A protein has these predicted regions:
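Short acidic-glycine-tyrosine-enriched beta hairpin
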Residues: 21-36
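Conserved beta-strand segments that form the floor/walls of ligand-binding pockets within enzyme
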Residues: 9, 34, 55
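Short secondary-structure boundary/capping segments
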Residues: 7, 24-25, 45
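Short beta-strand segments in beta-sandwich/barrel cores
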Residues: 13-18, 32-33, 41, 61
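Short, conserved beta-strand element in jelly-roll/cupin
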Residues: 2-17
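Short histidine-centered beta-strand/loop micro-motifs
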Residues: 1-2, 19, 44-46
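Ligand-binding loop in jelly-roll beta-barrel domains
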Residues: 28, 37-63
């Protein structure tokens, strides 16, 4: 990842989102998280229920 941005939108369920240097974010249905994508990140589903999410990523480069 080089200078772009990302957004996560939870369509259904709950997930925990981890951004390097930040406390974990507990996201639920309809929650949104926006961050620069050069920050280390990962997510997990800590429940037995399925999670559906939409992730959008931008690039600083023109294509």
């Amino acid at each position: 990842h080089h200078g772009g941005e990302e957004m996560v939108f939870v369509l259904e369920g709950q997930l925990t989102f981890y951004l390097e240097g930040h406390k974990p974010y507990k996201l639920e249905t309809y929650d949104t998280l926006y961050y620069p994508n050069y920050i280390g990140h990962r997510w997990s589903n800590d429940s037995d229920e399925p999670v559906r999410m939409l992730m959008v990523s931008t690039s600083p480069y023109n294509f």
